[in-house]
């Protein structure tokens, strides 16, 4: 289980001294206001944004974590709680950078990471509630994240490697989102690259079944994204998935061992009771 807490996110290592105790992590968290703005783009289209303006005073990491702990009050299994708290710190640092601007690829990346992390969590209802508490603690809209991730996934499933990178020559809602990202990444607006964005790109390629290695190069070029950064962060992501699998296997083994111990303990009193009754029967026969 220790493997999961050593995820190689640089931001997580910097924030290690802010990690809450297990008791605190088992509490839950509070809601913040969603900061949304809408900018018309190309006629009637609108692009929804979650963005911190220059005049905003960002909350501290401690305040964001406290919001989460207030909003979700049920205990979270420690193997999940540790990583969630570390991811929350990392995402807080991204969220309140002056260049941060929400986009659907980022949302897809985070949703992908979250769903991979929480796969196998005992309760689907709790898993959804934790997601809502997490995103709300960052003053963003959890429903927007899910809706945008779903739209991106549906679009990617209808694409192939070539059509994926030719978005700039096409019209459509998702194409408009990708064009906007490309323009901002080129310096025509606010854009802050992140590992979640890299995972979002990876997910698009995966769903489009774009296995040709050069497709990622072309997509990064079309989006004006540094391919070397994407490669590096996808290696980190794959490493995380590997650690998650190992940690969950350890958790499964631990749960099975504890279950077996409980069953053995429950059987022992019954055996003692049977022996006592047998001895009592022998005594009554002697008399």
Swiss-Prot record:
The gene is THF1. Disulfide bonds: none annotated. Residues 256-270 have a biased composition (Basic and acidic residues). NCBIfam families: PS_II_psb29. Keywords: Chloroplast, Coiled coil, Membrane, Plastid, Plastid outer membrane, Transit peptide, Transmembrane, Transmembrane helix. Its main location: plastid. This is Protein THYLAKOID FORMATION1, chloroplastic. It is a single-pass membrane protein. It comes from the Eukaryota. It is found in: Plastid, Chloroplast outer membrane; Plastid, Chloroplast stroma. Residues 237-267 form a coiled coil. Residues 1-190 are chloroplast intermembrane. The chain crosses the membrane at residues 191-213. GO terms for cellular component: chloroplast outer membrane; chloroplast stroma.
């Amino acid at each position: 289980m220790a493997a999961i807490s050593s995820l190689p996110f640089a931001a997580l290592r910097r924030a290690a001294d802010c990690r809450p105790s297990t008791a605190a992590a088992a509490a839950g968290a509070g809601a913040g206001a969603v900061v949304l703005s809408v900018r018309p783009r190309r006629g009637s289209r609108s692009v929804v944004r979650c963005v911190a303006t220059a005049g905003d005073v960002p909350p501290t990491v401690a305040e964001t974590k406290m919001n989460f702990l207030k909003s979700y009050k049920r205990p979270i299994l420690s193997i999940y709680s540790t990583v969630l708290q570390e991811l929350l710190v990392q995402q807080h640092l991204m969220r309140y950078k002056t260049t941060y601007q929400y986009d659907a690829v980022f949302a897809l990346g985070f949703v992908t990471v979250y769903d991979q992390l929480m796969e196998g969590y005992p309760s689907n209802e709790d898993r959804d509630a934790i997601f809502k508490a997490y995103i709300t603690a960052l003053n963003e809209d959890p429903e927007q994240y899910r809706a945008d991730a779903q739209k991106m996934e549906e679009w990617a499933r209808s694409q192939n490697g070539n059509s994926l990178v030719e978005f700039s020559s096409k019209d459509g809602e998702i194409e408009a989102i990708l064009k906007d990202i490309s323009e901002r990444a080129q310096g025509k607006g606010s854009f802050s690259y992140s590992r979640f964005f890299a995972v979002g790109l990876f997910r698009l390629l995966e769903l489009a079944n774009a296995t040709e290695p050069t497709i990622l190069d072309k997509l990064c070029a079309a989006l004006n994204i540094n391919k070397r950064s994407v490669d590096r962060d996808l290696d980190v992501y794959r490493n995380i998935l590997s650690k998650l699998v190992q940690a969950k296997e350890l958790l499964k083994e631990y749960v099975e061992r504890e279950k077996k111990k409980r069953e053995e303990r429950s059987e022992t009193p019954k055996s003692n009771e049977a022996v006592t009754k047998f001895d009592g029967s022998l005594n009554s026969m002697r008399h």
